[in-house]
Each structure stands twice: as structure tokens, then as C-alpha cells.
């Protein structure tokens, strides 16, 4: 049969000639590039959270909208909701206190201090995979309970802020005094695709604590927030869980005292749910039927809700007053002897064997039960170091209250970055070391002062490469995940940053810039470091025949050493910085993948990444002064030579050794070696997407465009942490 005959037959039958059923032919379905090439470079990660996915538009100002919010009325509505039990998801003891605390905890608890990703700062609990994690069973109901409130206040309160505020109000409603609340978390409108949740393909795959400590993961099993409450790999052993607890809470930047306070405080209120076997529980929200409207885990056990609810499979109530704050967690932990038992769902837990039935039933006031604990709760009694802290909290409830208030505040605000981002009437005045505090501004340089400082920098004798390198070293520590790092504070001049291997050459310019700061006394060192980069880029552009003024916004301040947590700042030390052709001797990923990772942390787009790398190479900004990727004989001139020479087919590239990290580029005709390069250089010729961008800048008409694009991207990086002026 000919094609025309097939088409005519299809038309006569009323069918689309090309859609005959069978395989899914909708957009995005079918075999894709990553099915064929699983290791394909994820350049698309740099296109996340653009204005194309934001229904509010680029002009939306959340801080401005929040200022219109009746904050006390909002808190009043949340408080009323706590005891407004709904038949479709009845509240335990008539209160949603425990549910909302868990929702806030599990939103914030995905944060990892190693890479700054995760956390509650963008409302990611609405999206996969977090909305469908095994550890988040039933939190879809918590979020749905909040919808009428979100609907009422609209864009004056983000989902991200509302989740955490609901947890705070729940604690306050239980009689607990919180440390405070800072709003300012802005929603995004799609899942974060850059977060590495792990390599496991099956939920609840166990991870060894030692390997966990080497990776930026915040849970011991895929799909958990922290640790398996039944012990490592459901071992039922409290003491063996200590290492896993320390590893996971440590990856969030929590010490032992904060860890004990958080576990005990979180388990002072509410309960776990394990009325029957997990076989009764249906699929998660992402896999549920369309008519389920985003709700998942429907249970076939009894009514499926209330007394019949199944969440974790554990059936534990810790306190005699599960909706009111108390010290019963520690009192029960140490007062009774505990025997291992199983929940109705078959999960391992512990029961107080010598205790009377003093725990109220959540739905039948005539019933009582014995106190119960999770395996990991008992770790706080049997691990020697945790036990010391727990006994202190047992004997000093006020110390426990203070420790939990501060630890909860840290947990729920850790990924928000500097205090300048916080808004609202309940922001505490106290500066905390984990917020990377900054002093008040001392200088307010005028335009004349700035011009004078630029002249001083020009006269200093520092080269373009030195000027650019010191500014980049200062600003490029910024992480878009938790908003830490950046040039504000001039922490490049402090420990530990001044001692990092990647900064060894860059910091050589600091004594000269510090002398300028002291003698002129017109601006902070932080401003002068960034201004040095401005001077370097302007000189390089001028040498290329393009006269351009690089934007500069003063107002940065200089942090003190006592405002700098060395251990936490060491987490900002890059494993790799492809912009400076730096890679530590750590086998974690390919160099080009680490380049994408760094660019994503700097919130750069793929074109911005391309322009910056090409510019940094011709400006001679390699961390060690090497010639790798410096495809020019005009170092210090902001030309497109990197792209022109990289894409020249007259050059043939070969690896110099078996590591495939360093390459030599030889003239195809003569065999003479012309250049050396790393994977962070050659990827702009090998990856199809990056090559397409490189071709734009290699074109003969691109010289001025390249300078303008480089300046725009450079200025963006220099100002990433300027929340004081945003």
C-alpha cells in the first residue's frame, strides 16, 4: 500500500493519518537523549526557575506584597485551623499541632550544609520527589488543609513561608515560646532538578553512615528526611543508630546538643501512625489517579483516616499531653524500662514495660495506652554523649526549651542566607553565627570617592589578571541554594578562605588592596576588592577596543573573624571551580559536570557561563597561572580568542595521560603543540549546547556583544549576595 493510500484510508475512517494509537506520541514522551546517553551533560539545569515558569511575572515583588499582609490575622487563621478538624482527615486529639510541626520539619529538614541545597526556602515540598517521599506520607493532607488560608491571602504569603509559619504557630499553640520567625522565602514553580538526592533507584535503600558523611546527602535512606526510625536498616538497635543520627544532623550543620533538642522537641507533640500493614496504603500523590487531585496514599484499612490512619507504619505517642508542650519526653525516656515490640503495622518500636497506661488515645477518650518510643528516641538515652545532654535537659526543662527554640529556628531558617533577607515583625534582633553576620556599614563612598579609588587601583601596579582573580575569588563562593558566600564581608581576607588552595594566587593582591583601603579610608575592603575587578575588566575591554563602564554598587562591609564560623565556611571551599580551571584531587564527578554545578550555584544561565569562562581564560585568571585554556597571545585583553581558537578545525586535541583531564592541542599540519586545555575548556567545543553558544561568540561580529555579555554576567556574580540593595 502506498503512503497516499494509507493516508486516504485514514482520512476516510475519520482518523488522523499520523496518530493511529499505540505508543504515546505526546510532547516529551518516547525515548529521549538521556535514555541513549545517560551521562549527557546537564546543561539544562541552568535554565531552571526562569520567568517562563513563573506565573507572577518578573516584576512581582514578594517583599512588597508581604508588607501588605495582616500578619496577626494570618496567624489567627492558622491557630483556628489547628483545632478545626476535618472529616476527610480528622485531627488527632482534635488538633493538627503535630501534623503541622512535621510538615514544617520535613520541609526544612532536606537542607544539606555541604552544598547548600534542599531546605524549605522555595516551597519544594509541593513538587516531586518530595511531595511523594515515603517519609512525607500524609503531608499532602497538611498542605491541603492550609489551602483555604493560602487562597485567602494570595501572594501576600508564599507557600514556603506558610509551611514554616504553620509549624511555628503550632508550637506556640501548644504553649511553647518560639525564638522567632523570619519570612522572605519566595516560591518557585517547578521542582529543583539540580539536587542530588542519591543514586538509589528504590525507595528506602540503606546508606552506610561512613559513606554518607562523604556525600552531600541528608538522609540515611533514599526517601527519608533523616534516619530510619527503626534503626539502621531497620535493625531495631538504638545504640547503633547514633552514628547515622550524627551523620545526618551533622550534614545540616547541627551539633549534638541541637540534635538532641530537635529530636526530643519534635517528639514532644503529636504521634506516628501505623494502624495496620502498609499493604493497605495506595500510591503516592505523583502516581495517584487524576481524580485524586494530587492526594495520595489512600488507605483501605477501615475508614483510612483518623484511628485507622497509616503513615510511617509506627504507632508511637511519646507524651501524656500530646497537644501541649511538656518535658514528658525526657521524663518517660529515663523513668521507664523499654522493651522492643512491634506496631500493628509490624514496625519495630519500644514500649515502656513498667509504665501504667497514661497516654490518651487520639480518638477515644475512654482509652489509654502505655508510653511508646522510636528506636532512635532511645538512642538519646543509650549513646553516652547524647545521654549526658538528655539528662541535663531532663533536669533542666528551661535549658531544653531554650535549646529547642534556637535549634528549631536554625532548622527552619538555615537555608535563607543572611539576615538581610528576613522580613516580618517577628525577626529576632540577635545575630547568630550560622547566619554569617555582618557589621553595620561604615562607609558611604561618593562617585568622586569611587573614581579616586579606581585611580589608586590603576596606579597600584596590579595586573588585569590579578585584579580579576582577586574579585572572582571573593564573590564566587556564593551559593544560590542557601544564599551563603559572596563578596560582601571580604571574608577572602579571613580564615579559612585566605588559606584555600584555590585562592593561593588570588590573595597575593590583598596586601596592596588593604593598603589602599587603609590610606584612603573611603570604602570597605569588600568594596575595594570588587572595585579591583571592575578596574581589571574595564582595562581589558578598553584594550580590546570596547569602552564600557562596569556597574558598581558600593555599600559592602567587612566581616570580623569572630563573625566567621571557620568550620561552616570551609564547606564553601570549592571542589572545583572551572571558571578558574581549578579542580581538587577528589573523585566525585567529571570536571565538566562540576563546572555546571558551580554555574548553577552561581545562578548563571548557559550563555552567562559561556561568556564568563571565555573571558576568564583570555584575562589569565586560572587559579595557578597556568596556560590551560588560554587560547590567546593577548592575555589581559577581553577578546573572543578563546572561542575562535577552540573552534578552529586546524587544531587536533589529544589527552596527555590516562586521566583524560589535561589535553594538548596540536596543529593538524605541523604537529606542533599550540595550546593545552582541561575538560572545563574543551567542553565548550564538545557539548552540542555549549558549542552552539561558543559559536555565537566566535563569529566575526561578536566582539562588542561578547564584552557586553561578559560585563553583565560578571556584574551579576559580584552582586549575588547584595540582599541589602535588592
UniProtKB/Swiss-Prot annotation:
Gene Ontology cellular component list: cytosol
EC number(s) per entry: 1.11.1.21
Single annotated GO MF: heme binding
Gene Ontology terms describing biological process: cellular response to hydrogen peroxide; hydrogen peroxide catabolic process
Entry keyword annotation includes Oxidoreductase: yes
Keywords carried by this UniProt record: Heme, Hydrogen peroxide, Iron, Metal-binding, Oxidoreductase, Peroxidase
Ranges annotated as biased composition (Polar residues): 1-13
Disordered, as annotated region: 1-34
Residues annotated to bind heme b: 267
Cross-link (Tryptophyl-tyrosyl-methioninium (Tyr-Met) (with W-105)): 226-252
Family designation: Belongs to the peroxidase family. Peroxidase/catalase subfamily.
Listed name of the protein: Catalase-peroxidase
Source taxonomy: Bacteria, Pseudomonadati, Pseudomonadota, Gammaproteobacteria, Enterobacterales
Amino acid at each position: 500500500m502506498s503512503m497516499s493510500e494509507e493516508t486516504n484510508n485514514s482520512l476516510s475512517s475519520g482518523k488522523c493519518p499520523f496518530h493511529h494509537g499505540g505508543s504515546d506520541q505526546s510532547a516529551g514522551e518516547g525515548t529521549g537523549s538521556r535514555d541513549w546517553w545517560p551521562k549527557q551533560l546537564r546543561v539544562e539545569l541552568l535554565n531552571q526557575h526562569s520567568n517562563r515558569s513563573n506565573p507572577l511575572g518578573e516584576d512581582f515583588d514578594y517583599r512588597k506584597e508581604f508588607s501588605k499582609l495582616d500578619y496577626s490575622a494570618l496567624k489567627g487563621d492558622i491557630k483556628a485551623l489547628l483545632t478545626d478538624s476535618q472529616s476527610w482527615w480528622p485531627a488527632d486529639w482534635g488538633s493538627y499541632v503535630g501534623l503541622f510541626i512535621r510538615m514544617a520539619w520535613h520541609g526544612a529538614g532536606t537542607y544539606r550544609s555541604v552544598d547548600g541545597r534542599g531546605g524549605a526556602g522555595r516551597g519544594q515540598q509541593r513538587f516531586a520527589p518530595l511531595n511523594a517521599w515515603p517519609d512525607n506520607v500524609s503531608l499532602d493532607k497538611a498542605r491541603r488543609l492550609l489551602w483555604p488560608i493560602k487562597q485567602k491571602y494570595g501572594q501576600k504569603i508564599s507557600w514556603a513561608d506558610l509551611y514554616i509559619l504553620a509549624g511555628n504557630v503550632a508550637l506556640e499553640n501548644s504553649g511553647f515560646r518560639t525564638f522567632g520567625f523570619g519570612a522572605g522565602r519566595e516560591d518557585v514553580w517547578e521542582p529543583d532538578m539540580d539536587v542530588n538526592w542519591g543514586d538509589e533507584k528504590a525507595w528506602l535503600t540503606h546508606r552506610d553512615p561512613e559513606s554518607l558523611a562523604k556525600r552531600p546527602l541528608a538522609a540515611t535512606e533514599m526517601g527519608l528526611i533523616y534516619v530510619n526510625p527503626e534503626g539502621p536498616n531497620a535493625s531495631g538497635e538504638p545504640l547503633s543508630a547514633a552514628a547515622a543520627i550524627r551523620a545526618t544532623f551533622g550534614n545540616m550543620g547541627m551539633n549534638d546538643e541541637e540534635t538532641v533538642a530537635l529530636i526530643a522537641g519534635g517528639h514532644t507533640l503529636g504521634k506516628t501512625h501505623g494502624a495496620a500493614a502498609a499493604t493497605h496504603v495506595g500510591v503516592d500523590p505523583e502516581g495517584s489517579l487524576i481524580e485524586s487531585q494530587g492526594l495520595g496514599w489512600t488507605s483501605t484499612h477501615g475508614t483510612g483516616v483518623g484511628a485507622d490512619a497509616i503513615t510511617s507504619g509506627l504507632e508511637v505517642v511519646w507524651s501524656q499531653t500530646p497537644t501541649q508542650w511538656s518535658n514528658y519526653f525526657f521524663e518517660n525516656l529515663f523513668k521507664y524500662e523499654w522493651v522492643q515490640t512491634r506496631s500493628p503495622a509490624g514496625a519495630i518500636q519500644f514500649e515502656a514495660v513498667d509504665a501504667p497506661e497514661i497516654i490518651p488515645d487520639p480518638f477515644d477518650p475512654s482509652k489509654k495506652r502505655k508510653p511508646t518510643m522510636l528506636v532512635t528516641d532511645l538512642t538519646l538515652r543509650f549513646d553516652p554523649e547524647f545521654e549526658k545532654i538528655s539528662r541535663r535537659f531532663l533536669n533542666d526543662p528551661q535549658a531544653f526549651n531554650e535549646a529547642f527554640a534556637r535549634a528549631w529556628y536554625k532548622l527552619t531558617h538555615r537555608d535563607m542566607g543572611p539576615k538581610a533577607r528576613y522580613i516580618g515583625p517577628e525577626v529576632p534582633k540577635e545575630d547568630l553565627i550560622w547566619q554569617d553576620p555582618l557589621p553595620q556599614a561604615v562607609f558611604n563612598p561618593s562617585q568622586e570617592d569611587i573614581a579616586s579609588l579606581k585611580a589608586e587601583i590603576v596606579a597600584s601596579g596590579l595586573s588585569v589578571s590579578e585584579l580579576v582573580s582577586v574579585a572572582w575569588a571573593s564573590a564566587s563562593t556564593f551559593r544560590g541554594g542557601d544564599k551563603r558566600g559572596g563578596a560582601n564581608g571580604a571574608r577572602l581576607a579571613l580564615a579559612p578562605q585566605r588559606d584555600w588552595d584555590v585562592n593561593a594566587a588570588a590573595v597575593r593582591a590583598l596586601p596592596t588592596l588593604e593598603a589602599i583601603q587603609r590610606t584612603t579610608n573611603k570604602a570597605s575592603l569588600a568594596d575595594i576588592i570588587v572595585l579591583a575587578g571592575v578596574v581589571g575588566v574595564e582595562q581589558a575591554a578598553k584594550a580590546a577596543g570596547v569602552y564600557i563602564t562596569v556597574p558598581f554598587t558600593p555599600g559592602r562591609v567587612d566581616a570580623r573573624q569572630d563573625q566567621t564560623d571557620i568550620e561552616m565556611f570551609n564547606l564553601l571551599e570549592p571542589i572545583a571551580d572551572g571558571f578558574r580551571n581549578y579542580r581538587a584531587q577528589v573523585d566525585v564527578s567529571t570536571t565538566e559536570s562540576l563546572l555546571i554545578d558551580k554555574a548553577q550555584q552561581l545562578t548563571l544561565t548557559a550563555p552567562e557561563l559561556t561568556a564568563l569562562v571565555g573571558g576568564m581564560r583570555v584575562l589569565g585568571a586560572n587559579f595557578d597561572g597556568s596556560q590551560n585554556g588560554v587560547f590567546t597571545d593577548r592575555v589581559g585583553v577581553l577578546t573572543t580568542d578563546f572561542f575562535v581558537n577552540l573552534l578552529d578545525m586546524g587544531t587536533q586535541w589529544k589527552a596527555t595521560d590516562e586521566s583524560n583531564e589535561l589535553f594538548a592541542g596540536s596543529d593538524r599540519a605541523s604537529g606542533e603543540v599550540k595550546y593545552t586545555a582541561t575538560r572545563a575548556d574543551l567542553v565548550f567545543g564538545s557539548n552540542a549546547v555549549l558549542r552552539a553558544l561558543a559559536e555565537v561568540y566566535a563569529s566575526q561580529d561578536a566582539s562588542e556583544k561578547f564584552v557586553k555579555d561578559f560585563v553583565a554576567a560578571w556584574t551579576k556574580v559580584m552582586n549575588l549576595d547584595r540582599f541589602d540593595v535588592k
